[in-house]
From Swiss-Prot:
It catalyses: (R)-pantoate + beta-alanine + ATP = (R)-pantothenate + AMP + diphosphate + H(+). It is found in: Cytoplasm. Its main location: cytoplasm. PANTHER family: CYTIDYLATE KINASE/PANTOATE-BETA-ALANINE LIGASE, PANTOATE--BETA-ALANINE LIGASE. Pathway: Cofactor biosynthesis; (R)-pantothenate biosynthesis; (R)-pantothenate from (R)-pantoate and beta-alanine: step 1/1. (R)-pantoate binds at residues 61, 153. The reaction proceeds by a bi uni uni bi ping pong mechanism. This is Pantothenate synthetase. One of its GO terms (molecular function) is ATP binding.
Length: 300
């Protein structure tokens, strides 16, 4: 495995791979790798000649009162995990390599960024889009891999790739969960034992909502109320949002139809957790297949 920390050298290596006709799969991360990240790496390994992993805690996507300074970091551990999973190139730049001076140009995400997490984290997705534009230009991948735990980020990246004509295939990968249903996250290390015992209630609430949809519930208000009541009954967390929206455009829904995202975010004392579930339903006005409107769960 090659470890790189300089942009110019990284670009030269990527050009060499391209001259050799090799396909490049890219997994951008902020490090502190877990099974969610390794599922992305493994998928990239299966589909590409070269797998590139970036580990960079991007300061642009953290707000002034967020956890940039204490975000978990352990590069040697990340290096070992990357090598074990067959990463070819590990790109680990410092902040002053990525941002040597104040930016004169940065991304502003016009759509899909002012709802869900974007409502309480203004500028977050602008920072995500800015660093991804830089990383895409550095790595020049054929495919980029993102986890569906952050479905809003995947939607934003989808728009970024399409609107700016990056010749990159976006590959969404299903959420990886603990045995009790909690979505894998680097921020789970912040949870106290009590909070950790309560956190699986997020996915349980989403599953209960999905079951209600499967039984025929189509009211977004009813689904939101059901999820909120379950979380309030089983945790001490403060609910940031419970939303039901279309995907990938993230338009809030009143009646469930088409591709539906049910998404939640909560705040425990030291950790903000997100989760979601995706449901496929007939679009409004579509004829069924004679078997009724059975929900199809595309991603978990």
């Amino acid at each position: 495995m090659i470890v790189m920390d300089q942009i110019a050298a990284m670009q030269a290596l990527m050009r060499q791979y391209r001259r050799e006709g090799k396909t490049i799969g890219f997994v951008p991360t902020m490090g502190y790798l877990h099974e969610g990240h390794t599922s992305l790496i493994d998928r990239a390994r299966a589909e590409n000649d070269i797998v590139v992993l970036s580990v960079f805690v991007n300061p642009l996507q953290f707000g002034p009162n967020e956890d940039f300074a204490r975000y978990p970091r352990d590069f040697e551990r990340d290096r070992r995990i990357a090598e074990q999973h067959g990463v070819d190139v590990l790109f680990h730049p410092e902040a002053d390599e990525m941002y040597p001076e104040p930016l004169t140009v940065r991304a502003i995400v016009q759509a899909r960024a002012d709802v869900l997490c974007g409502r309480s984290r203004p500028g977050h997705f602008d920072g995500v889009a800015t660093v991804l534009m830089k990383l895409f230009n550095i790595v020049m991948p054929d495919r980029a891999y993102f986890g569906m735990k952050d479905a809003q980020q995947v939607a934003v990246v989808d728009g970024l790739i399409r609107d700016l004509n990056f010749p990159i295939e976006l590959v969404p990968v299903p959420t990886v969960r603990e045995a009790d249903g909690l979505a894998k996250s680097s921020r789970n290390v912040y949870l106290s034992p009590q909070e950790r015992s309560e956190a699986p209630a997020l996915y349980a609430a989403l599953q209960a909502a999905a079951s209600a949809v499967e039984r025929g519930e189509r009211s977004a208000a009813a689904i939101r109320r059901m999820v909120r009541e379950h979380i309030e009954a089983h945790t001490h967390a403060e609910i940031d949002y419970v939303e039901v929206c279309s995907y990938p455009d993230l338009t809030p829904l009143e009646t469930l139809a088409g591709t539906v995202l049910i998404a939640v975010a909560v705040r425990f004392a030291s950790a903000r957790l997100i989760d979601n579930i995706m449901i496929e339903l007939p679009k409004t006005g579509e004829q069924g297949d004679g078997k009724g409107e059975q929900a199809c769960f595309a991603r978990s």
